[in-house]
Amino acid sequence: MSRNDKEPFFVKFLKSSDNSKCFFKALESIKEFQSEEYLQIITEEEALKIKENDRSLYICDPFSGVVFDHLKKLGCRIVGPQVVIFCMHHQRCVPRAEHPVYNMVMSDVTISCTSLEKEKREEVHKYVQMMGGRVYRDLNVSVTHLIAGEVGSKKYLVAANLKKPILLPSWIKTLWEKSQEKKITRYTDINMEDFKCPIFLGCIICVTGLCGLDRKEVQQLTVKHGGQYMGQLKMNECTHLIVQEPKGQKYECAKRWNVHCVTTQWFFDSIEKGFCQDESIYKTEPRPEAKTMPNSSTPTSQINTIDSRTLSDVSNISNINASCVSESICNSLNSKLEPTLENLENLDVSAFQAPEDLLDGCRIYLCGFSGRKLDKLRRLINSGGGVRFNQLNEDVTHVIVGDYDDELKQFWNKSAHRPHVVGAKWLLECFSKGYMLSEEPYIHANYQPVEIPVSHKPESKAALLKKKNSSFSKKDFAPSEKHEQADEDLLSQYENGSSTVVEAKTSEARPFNDSTHAEPLNDSTHISLQEENQSSVSHCVPDVSTITEEGLFSQKSFLVLGFSNENESNIANIIKENAGKIMSLLSRTVADYAVVPLLGCEVEATVGEVVTNTWLVTCIDYQTLFDPKSNPLFTPVPVMTGMTPLEDCVISFSQCAGAEKESLTFLANLLGASVQEYFVRKSNAKKGMFASTHLILKERGGSKYEAAKKWNLPAVTIAWLLETARTGKRADESHFLIENSTKEERSLETEITNGINLNSDTAEHPGTRLQTHRKTVVTPLDMNRFQSKAFRAVVSQHARQVAASPAVGQPLQKEPSLHLDTPSKFLSKDKLFKPSFDVKDALAALETPGRPSQQKRKPSTPLSEVIVKNLQLALANSSRNAVALSASPQLKEAQSEKEEAPKPLHKVVVCVSKKLSKKQSELNGIAASLGADYRWSFDETVTHFIYQGRPNDTNREYKSVKERGVHIVSEHWLLDCAQECKHLPESLYPHTYNPKMSLDISAVQDGRLCNSRLLSAVSSTKDDEPDPLILEENDVDNMATNNKESAPSNGSGKNDSKGVLTQTLEMRENFQKQLQEIMSATSIVKPQGQRTSLSRSGCNSASSTPDSTRSARSGRSRVLEALRQSRQTVPDVNTEPSQNEQIIWDDPTAREERARLASNLQWPSCPTQYSELQVDIQNLEDSPFQKPLHDSEIAKQAVCDPGNIRVTEAPKHPISEELETPIKDSHLIPTPQAPSIAFPLANPPVAPHPREKIITIEETHEELKKQYIFQLSSLNPQERIDYCHLIEKLGGLVIEKQCFDPTCTHIVVGHPLRNEKYLASVAAGKWVLHRSYLEACRTAGHFVQEEDYEWGSSSILDVLTGINVQQRRLALAAMRWRKKIQQRQESGIVEGAFSGWKVILHVDQSREAGFKRLLQSGGAKVLPGHSVPLFKEATHLFSDLNKLKPDDSGVNIAEAAAQNVYCLRTEYIADYLMQESPPHVENYCLPEAISFIQNNKELGTGLSQKRKAPTEKNKIKRPRVH
């Protein structure tokens, strides 16, 4: 209670009729210590009149009722009478909890939970808090007890190793119940052992390779210790497989299903130690075979342990042989490096009395150990305070090598990072001595850290003390100096007088540990250096003594205010660790910063800046001193207290991380909002997710933002949350939408995340000067983001060096250093190498001499433009771009530097799955070259996850990514994007994509883009085109190409019109050549006047409406599509336009196919105004080289009439400018017509075919009025999202159910499967469609006719060659039953495949619902139960005896068969649907019913009277009887 508070503190006892004796006892005991003037006894009526929290202490008994709920809702401080008695008795303060406290049974207990469902966890938290305990969500040192639902989590393992009690949730429930009954006063009154978490709780254990006795023992012990034993290995059920030897079918399946494969040692160690052990220590993997191949292709001597280094080790080229010592030294060294580890397994770790911080600062990776050895070493590292890494990366400082080192060799070859590679003996010696030993005597011979040569290596302080005794003294290497000098002389021939020392790069790679770093600069190996250059190099290297003493907050003083004592001391320690100074309130010195909580507090002292703990943590995270004004969270946030305007809001954050995200989450919770990590459309109670209402982000982009747009949810800036906090009212979202925010606002918000140094004063903060120095050593290309091309970076770098003034916080350099591309750059694993071109002198020579004031201007003469253009051309020719640039760019006027056009995958962030780790570097490089960003591990910024796997993959990584809703694509998506140099649709590349089963994507993409974008192109080019009503073929081509090129460049295509024209002409020429090739391959005599190239003159007889233009383009694209589908040759993208002659490989097979295609193409001979060209694609089926097509290709094929080409007459009175088209009986929607200029036409004209049927506009409109209600099946998540959005956009509905819904009209199926949803759709006669139907609808812009896209139609089955026999049967069944049932419906009979059936089901309860839905969807009546009276009514009885549980009550099958009921196995239902003629019932009869069937046959009474209904209707219903 602060002194400034005017309001007195009252203790109020709530009197009611239900008060217990304990209530009055508490009142008496408090009177002894508290003055009665501050004690009040209030009635329930008075309590209900309280309208706000008056900061009094309320004593309630019981903890229920209207009054209790009222006070709790107001946030009043409520305790039970037992709390008062306990506190009086133990002289303790009443807890200041934000929640009611009933008693103090758990007053000294702090719990954390693991592996509990959300509801259970919240219940545990509630009871613990009501019993005076504390709850932490994270496991930390303060936690005293862990409540576990099952074993195996990280919390569980840590708590078990720390010997913290791990108990069941029932312990909390029992404590609460006993305390309610007043039977206990402390948690220790109950025996905790009764509630201890069993060792194998939640484990389902299976074994392989064990003998019978061992297997039985494992089974008994598993059940005894709370686990479950399973004889069969079942996917998604078994959690552990105990393996004798790593081989066998169970072992292989377990590995694929991500089941823990462990040794028996894991099982018995867990029982011995009393808790479930970490499975990773006991992994069973086949021992890798020792490789006998040499590490280098260069012949070496027999003893090559030290010489077997690869080129990636060499960063100082002049000292390659510096560490090649004599063989005698090698032998003596090797004898030291091979420690004897036989006794390591039996080592007693507890025997060491080493300090807890012995390995402080060591980041250690263990390589080549397994079993007990690995366990012992891990325990040693943990006890010594070291950080143990599970993955070898550049953060590791020490690698301890054991029996094999294959993984280390790969890392050593790929990475320039050189950790200390030592044997286990070094670790054991450190622990036995009790202090850190020098690594040098223990370094492994094959892994010498040679990026700093041995003779020049900066030594640690420990090494300096022992320098005299070290075998690596300088005189040992005197003979090698001559070789070094020779290398230096040789290298100097290529340096052209360069004064750059290679050690400049080395100084960046490894931090200096001592002031002796300057010594190598005066060494004899650098005699060729000039004197003044030595001084410039030494200027680059800062003094070590200054580095060690300075920190981020050097010379800065701080006041810490408004925090609890614990938090205040933690913050003070952090500031001191970063060289800051903590001031006391009594000090007269003005502090630079006052650190306060996010919501602020009263600061009476005079300070320079008032900042929040968010600012402090962010500065430390980025090691940069930020300007407090750069982010609103860096200064106290004004909040209207007591207001919760966001109570009904569920908020998700995007593009926020670290302290910033934590602060925003705290602020949102304070305002009453719920914050969740996932952005979801619908609530999911099982996963504890609520439907999101708001997305807060910094800039447009990312999967969450796209989802928000799709779902019409507000995506707002952080300012919306701050404004809501300031006013206490929910701010209007429309004023804070991310779309409306300016670029400056967004960039300001993203500065923290991108780590921009906003206020780094170098004079005051030499620590930041060190960072600046390090940046000057590397090349100025943006090596991390990979967003700019190398050649542009060179030119822009030169302009910045000459024209731009130094940025704030960066020191002026006396002389900029050159940036040599050393091997350590271009062999770096994590970076894409881009060569740096030194064109400074060349550009300087081109500058026009002028006055001194003009010298700093950027050269902008036409010659410099030529250089840039030719560099662009060189890069374009060396990479596989989709469209080659012109070989002769025209000289333009000097232009100011423009912003670079975004690359195809701009704003895409990819992450490659661990499953494809071998290809990760390669794929990351490709992504970077396309303008994408990449992440080594998955985080919330990732938009595309690259994965390859099965349709229902159980991989944990895949599952977790799938829940995030990002694009999951195949690696071939990225490869094809690079091939096409464009952003291809992700839906065409699911993670199951197999290129061997598909045709070229580029054909699909081009055709689809042309069709979908043409209309907008026509309508938007009125100013550009002289006459938009008369379009020639080439105009259409140009427009489509222009659209494709301008789409990614955001409208910058106008400036590149010449380049686009050149590209268009080139594309047209390539197409002409390919068309000529096709036509020349055939021996067909050409009609008179027919040409082999596209007509440039065109034809003016095209329709004068935009719609007809679109129709024209659509017809033409279908012809081109047919050509694309028939040829697989792709023109060389590197061919320049000037190269008229191409050297190609003559493929005779391809020539034959082109001839076959040409023979199938029947060109019309009359340029009729409304002629439509259609290609016969059915003959393509005969090709032995046919491959399955993609969905959009199938869609375009199916739109074409598979019949011969027809030429129809133009209608005299077109209605609404739509054409009446002759079609087949299948009622196709009229296909748009192509103009006559699509291909050259010959004379004389061909006579028109007779019309079969005309569809009028009225019929079409009637057809469109029908309902479109879809269900989706066997599609991946990306396709589901895409198609749901498409269907809703076209006016249809989507039912998102796992099971079949009879109200649906269409079901789109990825693959025909024998599952409930598919079979039920077949039985109900629904449209069962291929996904290409939706692609066709997307292209047409409305729902099209279904026949050609139906599973079972020839247009689908003929192009899908990869489906098996069962899938084909299922597909044909769908079409057959749909036609049957539709015919019956047309005749007025509404029924399904099973109409007339009255079924008794005798199946397992878990499967009964599925069978029931299936039968009912086909019109069957399912009778309740299987009692004898029902046999009179029933026609069929289906039973699945094999899968019934033993305790299921039986059914009298013999009695049913006697009453002429078909008693069949359940397989009959699916086969009845799939087979063309109904299957014979005898093949499916249950054993008990076979004799009755045979008797009926002999007597000739195949059917009972109940099956022989006299009506015609029953004859139709029962066509299957034999």
Swiss-Prot record:
Protein name according to UniProt: DNA topoisomerase 2-binding protein 1
Subcellular location: Nucleus; Chromosome; Cytoplasm, Cytoskeleton, Microtubule organizing center, Centrosome; Cytoplasm, Cytoskeleton, Spindle pole
Induction cue: Up-regulated during the S phase of the cell cycle. Up-regulated by E2F1 and interferon.
Disordered, as annotated region: 1018-1058, 1083-1118, 1501-1522
Native source organism of the sequence: Homo sapiens
GO molecular function term, any single one: phosphorylation-dependent protein binding
Post-translational modification: Phosphorylated on serine and threonine residues in response to X-ray irradiation.
Cellular component GO terms held in the UniProt record: actin cytoskeleton; BRCA1-B complex; centrosome; chromosome; condensed nuclear chromosome; cytoplasm; male germ cell nucleus; nuclear body
UniProt effect for mutating residue 250 to A: Abolished interaction with phosphorylated HTATSF1
Bias kind Acidic residues: ranges: 1024-1036
Residues modified as Phosphoserine: 301, 860, 864, 886, 888, 1002, 1504
Residues that span the membrane, as ranges: none
Gene Ontology BP, a term: DNA metabolic process
Family to which the UniProt record says this protein belongs: Belongs to the TOPBP1 family.
Oligomeric form and interacting partners: Interacts (via BRCT domains 1 and 2) with (phosphorylated) MDC1; promoting TOPBP1 recruitment to DNA damage sites during mitosis. Interacts (via BRCT domains 7 and 8) with (autophosphorylated) ATR; promoting activation of ATR. Interacts (via BRCT domains 7 and 8) with (phosphorylated) POLQ; specifically binds POLQ phosphorylated by PLK1, promoting POLQ recruitment to DNA damage sites. Interacts (via BRCT domains 1 and 2) with (phosphorylated) RAD9A. Interacts (via BRCT domain 2) with (phosphorylated) TP53BP1. Interacts (via BRCT domain 2) with (phosphorylated) HTATSF1.
